[in-house]
Amino acid sequence: HISEMIMQIHHTKHHQAYINNLKACTEKLKQAEQANDVAAMNALLPAIKFNGGGHINHTIFWTNMAPSAGGEPAGPVADAITKEFGSFQAFKDKFSTASVGVKGSGWGWLGYCPKNDKLAVATCQNQDPLQLTHGLIPLLGLDV
C-alpha cells in the first residue's frame, strides 16, 4: 500500500518536474538548432534523456496504479507470467530482488520482448527508459 499523500507528491511534484524540465530543454534545443549551435545541442542530450525518461516512466507507472488493486493477475497476463517464471510468486520474487538491487535511483520492470515473444524482468538506472535501454516493451514499472 502506498499512501495517498505520497502518490500526490509523486504525481504533482516529481512527475510534473520532469515534464517542466523536458519542456524547458526542448525549447533550449529548438533555440540551439536555430542557431546551429551543435555544442549546445549535444550538451542538452543528457537532460533530455533524463527528463524525457522520467516523464515516460512515470506515465507508465500511473497506468499501473489503481485504488484497492492488487492480487494475482488473471487471463493471458497470468498465463504468460506462469509460462515465463513458473508461478506468480516466482515472478514477484524475481521482480522484488531485481528492484531492490538497483543502486541509487532507478526502476524495476516487467517487460515484453517482441524478438523472442517472452516476458523479462529488468532494471534501469535513474530515469533511463526500458525500451531504449533493453529493447523491452514496459508492462509494469516500479520506481525505486
Swiss-Prot record:
Catalytic activity field: 2 superoxide + 2 H(+) = H2O2 + O2
Binding site for Mn(2+): H10, H58, D143
Main subcellular location: mitochondrion
Cross-referenced SUPFAM superfamilies: Fe,Mn superoxide dismutase (SOD), C-terminal domain (SSF54719), Fe,Mn superoxide dismutase (SOD), N-terminal domain (SSF46609)
Co-factor remark: Binds 1 Mn(2+) ion per subunit.
Keywords associated with the record: Manganese, Metal-binding, Mitochondrion, Oxidoreductase
Lineage top rank: taxon: Eukaryota
Signal peptide stretch: none
Coiled coil: none
Molecular function (Gene Ontology), one example: manganese ion binding
Cofactor list: Mn(2+)
EC number: 1.15.1.1
Localization terms from the record: Mitochondrion matrix
GO cellular component: mitochondrial matrix
Known function: Destroys superoxide anion radicals which are normally produced within the cells and which are toxic to biological systems.
Subunit structure: Homotetramer.
Protein family (similarity comment): Belongs to the iron/manganese superoxide dismutase family.
Protein name per Swiss-Prot or TrEMBL: Superoxide dismutase [Mn], mitochondrial
Naturally occurring in which organism (per UniProt): Palinurus vulgaris
